[in-house]
Curated annotation (Swiss-Prot):
Keyword vocabulary terms for this entry: Developmental protein, Disulfide bond, Glycoprotein, Immunoglobulin domain, Secreted, Signal
Domain PSI: 474-523
Keyword Nucleotide-binding found: no
A GO BP annotation: negative chemotaxis
Source species of the chain: Caenorhabditis briggsae
Assigned protein family: Belongs to the semaphorin family.
Ranges of residues in domain Ig-like: 518-604
Subunit structure: Interacts with plx-2.
Listed name of the protein: Semaphorin-2A
Role according to the record: Regulates the formation or stabilization of cell-cell contacts at several stages of epithelial morphogenesis. In early embryonic development, required for proper ventral closure of the epidermis. During male tail morphogenesis, regulates precursor cell sorting and allows the formation of distinct sensory rays. Seems to control cell-cell contact formation through 2 parallel pathways, one involving efn-4 and one involving plx-2 and unc-129. Involved in axon guidance.
Subcellular location: Secreted
Glycosylation, residue list: N61, N149, N271
Signal peptide: 1-20
Length: 656
């Protein structure tokens, strides 16, 4: 129950609306989909319906020949006609990218596209986008239907015979009824070295209608993240769990048992939940990003609840060391007619399921029979304390920027075009987070399809309208030192009282303030930030500058909204029809941190005029002041003319 209460009392998010710095579009092609970025070269690759583009990440609208390339995806009229005659939806016949990845040390781009409902593989030069080999049709790499959740990763090293290959989590069959983790036949110099290998799609203990969200090449393994049906409850409802599965790169299947089937496949549940007597689980993994930092590998993943009236989302982080430890040592589940139970440690054979072997053909049939039926680890992998649990939104995508003392998370709700920027850092043995800002992205009202990040500079989003480029920070819009120093990309100019983008030059310069602590306001702000003083009169209306996502307090107590006290979407506080009781100190806080402070002084004895006589009296006073101003202006004008005349009659420049 406590978990539900926590979700219900979450701080309300106020949304700013930001336009893209640049938007790239091409009227000759359809919807933009996949993004792939080379941060070293500043090259952004965008896949779409009809073409693949190479853009310059610092300005995606620059189409100069040195930074821009385009590869057209072509479908002949005959092929299109044949496809449309059998397709359930003609849109599926259009040539469209489904998967982009680097290969050959990023000198090449591996592309899988759906062309006339055929999965077509291309390998392109990463600069010119010219074909480096003949396009070919290959099933099992990417899906025809873009609504199917699939994943793939190119693995150039560590495979048998060091042959480059692709690992995919995919659906195959006419209706996509076969769910499998697959590696195509390994070839080298045109010769097949090993046959393809996969999971058993006819046995749902391996994969039960999985929805794949990500896959990663990690050491001697490949990891797959997905959600799947765990079981049906007593009401006949399908219970979904999020999983991570692992296979060994060297796996070539068994000799007799598990022939051309993974011998190393093992999986475990991912636990992203709010701790309580009855934990509240976020069971639907939506997206995942890898972060390698300080010798450790982390996976940041977004999760949601089931699609109910109380849909909620959160972000959890998993450590590779924790994943491997559980998969290597955890008790394994066995399924019987009476249900599932964990086998004891002494029942696990010497060759434990999930263990990598230099030659999987040498594993005994007995061990493989055990591995075939013991695929799931009984315990779950903890994702720690959920980051920014929030109601009424689904975090569909995530990006992570690695800074020295923190990671900056960008979470997105694709259908509502929302973005959250969050600071995440470790303090001692505890991980902490802080919400920096929330924004609505202007993508012409279209759903966000994919996102990518140029660290410290821009993030990118694709939609039906094009590719949109956004700065990671809008420092110039932050009105206070507190807000400015909290943003890791910004620095406060104490002399001009303005916020600007942090640079190596101003980061340590005198007069510039930026927080050296992750997610915290710089203590120097208290010395330079002035308390706003508002002099108001009875009956007035005015506003106090605040911060998005903040809550207001007056004299240390929470201020409730009313007809006279209104908080705007920008976080400002508007007070109407001022009363004596409105005098006091107002503070805008977020996560317990004071962002803005103002003192309101109400002048009781100088009320606005309420009668005609009082208005006429005020008018006479203003007329007197206006006459005095005009007289002073005339005196200044006469003096200025005399000064000009003196200069004109004085010595010339040549005479000086």
């Amino acid at each position: 129950m406590k978990a539900w209460i926590l979700l219900l009392v979450l701080t309300r998010c106020s949304w700013g609306l930001i336009s893209a710095d640049n938007t790239f579009s091409d009227r000759t092609i359809g919807e933009f989909r996949e993004l792939l970025i080379n941060t070293k070269d500043g090259a952004l690759f965008a896949g779409s319906e009809g073409a693949i583009f190479r853009l310059w990440a610092y300005n995606i609208n620059d189409t100069g020949e040195n930074v821009f390339s385009k590869k057209q995806l072509i479908l002949s009229e005959t092929e299109e006609s044949e496809c449309c005659s059998t397709a359930s939806d003609e849109k599926l016949c259009r040539p469209s990218t489904r998967f982009l990845a680097f290969t050959n040390n990023k000198d090449s781009i591996y592309v899988c596209s759906s062309v006339g409902m055929r999965p077509e593989i291309r390998v392109l030069d990463s600069i010119s986008l010219q074909d480096q080999q003949e396009p070919r049709t290959e099933i099992g790499i990417c899906v025809v239907d873009p609504t199917f959740n699939s994943t793939a990763v190119v693995v150039d090293n560590g495979n048998p015979e060091d042959a480059s290959s692709v690992y995919s989590g995919i659906r195959t069959g006419m209706g996509g009824e076969n769910h499998l983790i697959y590696r195509p036949p390994l070839t080298k110099n045109g010769k097949q070295l090993h046959a393809s290998i996969r999971t058993i799609y006819s046995d749902n203990k391996w994969l039960n209608e999985p929805q794949f969200v990500g896959s990663f090449d990690v050491g001697q393994h490949v990891l797959f993240f997905f959600r799947e049906i765990a079981h049906d409850n007593s009401f006949g409802e399908r219970i979904i769990h999020s999983r991570v599965a692992r296979v060994c790169k060297k796996d070539i299947g068994g000799r007799n048992v598990l022939r051309q089937v993974w011998t190393s496949f093992v999986k475990a549940r991912l636990n992203c939940s709010v701790s309580a007597n009855f934990p509240f689980y976020f069971d639907h993994i939506q997206s995942v990003k890898r972060v390698d930092k300080h010798g450790e590998t982390f996976f940041y993943a977004t999760f949601s609840t089931s699609e109910t009236a109380f849909t909620s989302s959160a972000i959890c982080m998993f450590q590779l060391s924790s994943i491997n430890h559980l998969l290597d040592t955890g008790l394994l589940m066995e399924e019987t007619a009476n249900g599932q139970f964990a086998v004891t440690a002494d029942e696990i054979p010497a060759h434990r399921p999930g263990t990598c072997s230099s030659n999987s053909h040498s594993i005994s049939d007995t061990d493989l029979h055990f591995a075939k039926t013991h695929l799931l680890v009984s315990d779950s992998i903890s994702g720690g304390t959920p980051i920014l649990p929030l109601r009424d939104h689904v975090y569909t995508q995530i990006l992570v920027d690695q800074l020295n003392n923190q990671n900056v998370i960008f979470a997105f709700d694709s259908s509502q075009q929302k973005m959250w920027k969050i600071s995440h850092w470790k303090e001692g043995n505890e991980w902490k987070w802080n919400l920096i800002e929330t924004q609505t992205l202007k993508t012409s009202g279209f759903r966000i399809n994919d996102v990518a990040l140029l660290p410290g500079e821009f993030f990118f989003a694709t939609s039906k309208a094009g590719v949109h480029q956004f700065s990671v920070a809008r420092c110039q819009e932050l009105p206070s030192c507190a807000l400015c120093s909290m943003d890791p990309y910004c620095s406060w100019n104490a002399v001009n009282s303005k916020c600007a983008l942090k640079t190596k030059t101003n980061e340590k310069s005198v007069g510039w303030i930026s927080s050296s602590w992750a997610g915290r306001i710089s203590p120097e702000c208290s010395a330079v930030e002035k308390l706003q003083v508002k002099d108001v009169y009875l009956g007035d209306g005015f506003k106090i500058q605040g911060a998005r996502g903040g809550t207001w307090q007056k004299d240390g107590r929470d201020l409730e909204e009313s007809q006279r006290h209104v908080a705007t979407s920008q976080g400002e506080l508007v007070i109407l029809n001022v009363d004596v009781e409105d005098a006091g100190t107002y503070e805008c806080t977020r996560n317990g941190v004071i962002l803005m402070r103002a003192r309101v002084v109400v002048h009781e004895n100088c009320a606005r005029p309420t009668s005609v006589a009082e208005y006429r009296s005020c008018q006479r006073e203003w007329c007197k002041k206006a006459d005095a101003y005009k007289a002073a202006l005339n005196i200044w004008s006469d003096s200025n003319k005399k000064n000009v005349q003196c200069k004109a009659n004085g010595p010339s420049i040549n005479g000086l």
